[in-house]
Amino acid sequence: MMFLTQLVSALFLFFLGPISYGKPVETFVLPLAQDAPIPPSEDPFYQPPPGYEETEPGTVLRQRRPPFPISLFRSAPIDLAATYQVLYRSSDTFGQPTATVSTILIPHNANMSKVLSYQVVEDAAFINCAPSYALQLHSDPGGLFGTIIIQSELLLITAALENGWVVTIPDYEGPAAAFLAYWRAGYATLDGIRATLASSGFTGVDPDAAVGLWGTSGGSVASAFAADLHPKYAPELNIVGAALGGVVPSITTALHSLNKGFDAGIIVSGVIGLSKEYTYMQPILESYLVPHLRDKFMSAGKKCSGAVSLDFRMEDIFSYFKGGEESGLFADPRVKAILDHNAMPQGVPEIPILILKSVNDEISPISDTDALVEKYCSNGVTIDYKRDLLSVHTILAVTGAPEAVLWLRDRLDGITVEKGCKTSTIFMTLLQPGALEVMSKTIIDNLLNLLGKPVGPRLRTEIVHVPPL
């Protein structure tokens, strides 16, 4: 088995294309004997070249084929027509130059004029949890069940690939894993789309492709910020719609919902992530941490979300701070300002938006999303808001996926949506017209993908050229 693993690794590395800085081409060599991908914290591919700061946002700084194949649950490679990773120039929260990576998945029989930007639920303050790494065969999960959510999301992503769409997956938290820094996430998402469209010379993606946005939970907020920032930051992009599931408009409200729950660790990762973006928060955090609890708290910065959730499950996170809930870290006006800066909305989208939300959402109360929709609608945004009576936050990510796929399919097919706002309270999103059919097909496709079926529609949706390996 080890020999087979090394043989597969060697073949992938042999066919790995040169890595370019734009003009001069640098050959990127990895050791053939490695049996797992190098994590981002150690991989030189993730380090931008000198002078990158002078390039425009969305510029491709470097490109490669992933060292290891994209795989279901880190163990079962899926058969794609091609996969690329691009390091590209972006902007941080404060508009300063930064660089991050997006992974571009091209299905068999792809329609290169349709692109989906999928924002995963990373929810971690550790760079080695980034999807560009986590989705590769034999990646380290960053603790027990660390990247299990990202692994599971590949099952949803394949539903998009089976429609023939090119899927780009940005590492929207950036090189420091600034979880909850959603301005950065929005910029990284938009610049990831720019980079994907600019990759046409080596990927074959149509530079004028129509683009959809999709994300659930934390990924939905990154997608929403991209929609908010799109009109001013990247108005040239032909984004045709955004599907948001389980959106979390207010971090402050979510803190109280998460505390003492199974996912209380999200609070810990969020605090560490924000302190990486807003560096002046670091000494503030240190001043509030209870000394004998500090090491455990900060250990979350070296683990991925599933492992952090296990470490802090059912704990009172406010007790980690001097002053507790009443006068601790989150009562500090400097920290409250940071949380408010990353609340929604932060702009007025010009694209139609589908919002799916559980009435019984245990992480972010439905009232927050009701208020968000009201703000959007009062500013003329076209919204289709569906309130699901039966689901909870996590379940909606699965049961709402078929509705998101159907809605995005119409947008990418050029079917216009009626302007204005529409709110409906439904029994279950999965019972919407066509949803069960999509769910059934997705389950069957994923089972067949595990058996080696080429990922993509059976009939070619457009004659395209995918550069050979």
From Swiss-Prot:
Disulfide bond recorded as keyword: yes
Compositionally biased region (Pro residues): 40-51
Catalytic residues (UniProt): S217, D361, H393
Enzyme's top EC category: hydrolase
Location relative to the cell: Secreted
EC number of the protein: 3.1.1.3
Protein's UniProt name: Lipase A
InterPro entries in the cross-refs: AB_hydrolase_fold, Lipase_secreted
Glycan attachment residues as annotated in the record: N111
GO cellular component terms given for this protein: extracellular region
Quaternary structure annotation from Swiss-Prot or TrEMBL: Monomer.
Start and end residues of each stretch annotated as Disordered: 40-59
Main location: secreted
Signal peptide: 1-22
S-S bridge residues: C129-C304, C377-C421
Organism the protein comes from: Arthroderma benhamiae (strain ATCC MYA-4681 / CBS 112371)
Recorded catalytic activity of this chain's protein: a triacylglycerol + H2O = a diacylglycerol + a fatty acid + H(+)
Role noted for this protein: Hydrolyzes triglycerides, with a preference for substrates with short-chain lengths (C4 to C8).
Record key words, sorted: Disulfide bond, Glycoprotein, Hydrolase, Lipid degradation, Lipid metabolism, Secreted, Signal, Virulence
Any Pfam family hit: LIP
Keyword Transmembrane: no
Membrane-spanning ranges: none
GO MF annotations in UniProt: triacylglycerol lipase activity
